[in-house]
Curated annotation (Swiss-Prot):
One of its GO terms (molecular function) is thioredoxin-disulfide reductase (NADPH) activity. Coiled coil: none annotated. Keywords: Cytoplasm, Developmental protein, Differentiation, Disulfide bond, Phosphoprotein, Redox-active center, Repeat, Spermatogenesis. PANTHER family: THIOREDOXIN-LIKE PROTEIN 1 (PTHR46115). The modification Phosphoserine is found at S362, S392. One of its GO terms (biological process) is cell differentiation. It comes from Homo sapiens. Residues 429-553 form the Thioredoxin domain. Residues 113-442 are annotated as: 22 X 15 AA approximate tandem repeat of Q-P-K-X-G-D-I-P-K-S-[PS]-E-[KE]-X-I. Sequence repeats lie at residues 113-127, 128-142, 143-157, 158-172, 173-187, 188-202, 203-217, 218-232, 233-247, 248-262, 263-277, 278-292, 293-307, 308-322, 323-337, 338-352, 353-367, 368-382, 383-397, 398-412, 413-427, 428-442. Disulfide bonds join C480-C483. This is Thioredoxin domain-containing protein 2. Residues 1-37, 77-442 are annotated as: Disordered.
């Protein structure tokens, strides 16, 4: 140890003349017949600076690390041909790529070294990965121990355990033999592989270390080197984003292009020339206009269509957004049509995704239906559910148990008995009877003797005045269709039976009388004699009404 230290001191004082020879000889002795002479020459030319810095470090720390540094230094520079676990070591003039499990992608500007101890060597790059890797460059000599991060002017990159260094273009290392390659893209998919663009370096996992052409990075378990352009390190489904788009999924990378993004299930890795998109089970990558990623094999569509239906339902219309549930009702500009299970309306400008939260988004419409969602088109907003009621600009025909068409000119509301009412016309019919509007209901036969009751006192006075004669009281309402139907007949009976007193009570105007007489429905007819009720009839029953009057009088 003392001899080595003295040699170091003498070589530094005398200049850089003696040390290179000593270093070269030492390297030749430890190389054991290494044929890679170019790397030795490059390293030997850098020895003076390296020795100087190592000497300074040794003196600062009481000369304790110099032997270890020189030993590790020589050992690492000579291990290029001895890779662990039988990994192939391809070599090029500008870069060296070492992928895992026989994958060996090579580019003219890339250096990839992911695994324990792979040591590719190039004239401009030295990559050493292990706990105490010592990268060497022409300007810097850094002696890191366990997670130190040396930096050189060229590229020293040292990843450990699956670290994936990236060059200025794109390296791709897929697992299990999948090696897709595009002219501008290389996508790495292994459960957490990260696609890289020309301006991004993204490495997710416990110690991923992205790399640029101007920075050397030497991380261990979580060290995060950052490049001059964009370094992104997402962990487990983090989604880095590049100037165009870079998306990294877990389990089933799904890249998407600017025209059509297609996502296959679990492991399919389609490649586009512009965009790499990789979502995780439902991640939604977005392209300049549309990027849609459905779950479990859903297929996102082109710039104008992103349709993800459930059970094959693919509704599409030219200007509509339709989301059917077992009977959803897609609507057109003039008609409302209700398709059930399997109806496939299709539109070029809509995006329809009915299922579990899939959220496709397009520049014109983003529609997300889930079991009874409410799709809304530029001109219509329709909500159908079992017995949906579609409404169009000109027609609205909602069918449920009773058809209730509604238009600006006609409105029909049936309750037990049909009671349609409109702004201009009220035409309720029951059993063929034709009702008359209020203007006509006032036209009763000549000699009409029906008295209208306005208050409780008036009602009591009328009963007292009648004495022993039969009093027939009609409890009705103006909004009641059957009441309007039988009212003319009631007035006709008043002419026919002159010995009977006919009274008419408006249920809305005389609520006190209605409560006292316990009226439950309209029309109701009550019959009094001597101020006491003798009979009651509910409903617009003409024949029965006439029979009761004839019997009681």
């Amino acid at each position: 140890m003392d001899v080595d230290k003295e040699l170091g001191m003498e070589s530094v004082k005398a200049g850089a003349s003696g040390k290179p020879e000593m270093r070269l000889g030492t390297q030749e002795e430890t190389s054991e017949g290494d044929a890679n002479e170019s790397s030795l020459l490059v390293l030997s030319s850098n020895v003076p600076l390296l020795a100087l810095e190592f000497l300074e470090i040794a003196q600062a720390k009481e000369k304790a690390f110099l032997p270890m540094v020189s030993h590790t230094f020589h050992m690492r520079t000579e291990e290029s041909d001895a890779s662990q676990e039988g990994d192939d070591l391809p070599k090029s003039s500008a870069n060296t790529s070492h992928p895992k499990q026989d994958d060996s992608p090579k580019s003219s500007e890339e250096t990839i070294q992911p695994k324990e101890g792979d040591i590719p060597k190039a004239p401009e790059e030295t990559i050493q990965s292990k706990k105490e890797d010592l990268p060497k460059s022409s300007e810097k000599a850094i002696q890191p121990k366990e997670s130190n991060i040396p930096k050189s002017s060229a590229k020293p990159i040292q990843p450990k355990l699956g670290n994936i260094p990236k060059a200025s273009v794109k390296p791709s290392q897929p697992k299990e033999g999948d090696i897709p390659k595009a002219p501008e893209e290389t996508i790495q998919s292994k459960k957490e592989d990260l696609p890289k663009s020309s301006e991004e370096a993204i490495q997710p996992k416990e110690g991923d270390i992205p790399k640029s052409s101007a920075k050397p990075i030497q991380p261990k378990l979580g060290n995060i080197a950052k490049t001059s352009v964009k370094p992104s390190q997402p962990k487990e489904s983090d989604i880095p984003k590049s100037p165009e788009e870079t998306i990294q999924p877990k389990e089933g990378d799904i890249p998407k292009s600017s025209a059509k993004p297609i996502q296959p299930k679990l492991g399919n890795i389609p490649k586009a020339s512009v965009k790499p998109s990789q979502p995780k089970e439902g991640d939604i990558s977005k392209s300049p206009e549309e990027a849609i990623q459905p779950k479990e094999g859903d297929l996102p569509k082109s710039l104008e269509e992103a349709i993800q239906p459930k059970e094959g339902d693919i509704p599409k219309s030219p200007e509509e957004a339709i989301q059917p549930k077992e009977g959803d009702i897609p609507k057109s500009l003039e008609e409302a049509i209700q398709p059930k299970e399997g109806d496939i309306p299709k539109s070029p400008e809509e995006t329809i995704q009915p299922k579990k939260g899939d959220i496709p988004k397009s520049p014109e419409e983003a529609i997300q239906p889930k079991e009874g969602d409410i799709p809304k088109s530029p001109k219509q907003a329709i909500q159908p559910k079992e017995g949906d009621i579609p409404k169009s600009l000109e027609e609205a025909i909602p069918p449920k148990e009773i058809d209730i068409p509604k238009s600006p000119e006609e409105t029909i509301q049936p309750k037990e008995d049909d009671s349609p009412k409109s702004l201009e016309e009220a035409t309720p019919s029951k059993e063929g009877d034709i009702l008359k509007p209020e203007e006509e209901t006032m036209e009763f036969p000549e000699g009409d003797k029906v008295k209208v009751i306005l208050s409780k006192e008036d009602f009591e006075a009328s009963l007292k005045e009648a004495g022993e004669r039969l009093v027939a009281v009609d409890f009705s309402a103006t909004w009641c269709g059957p009441c309007r139907t039988i009212r003319p007949f009631f007035h006709a009976l008043s002419v026919k039976h002159e010995d009977v007193v006919f009274l008419e009570v408006d249920a809305d105007n005389c609520e006190e009388v209605v409560r006292e007489c316990a009226i439950m429905c309209v029309p109701t007819f009550q019959f009094y004699k001597k101020e006491e009720k003798v009979d009651e009839l509910c409903g617009a029953l003409k024949e029965k009404l006439e029979a009761v009057i004839a019997e009681l009088k």
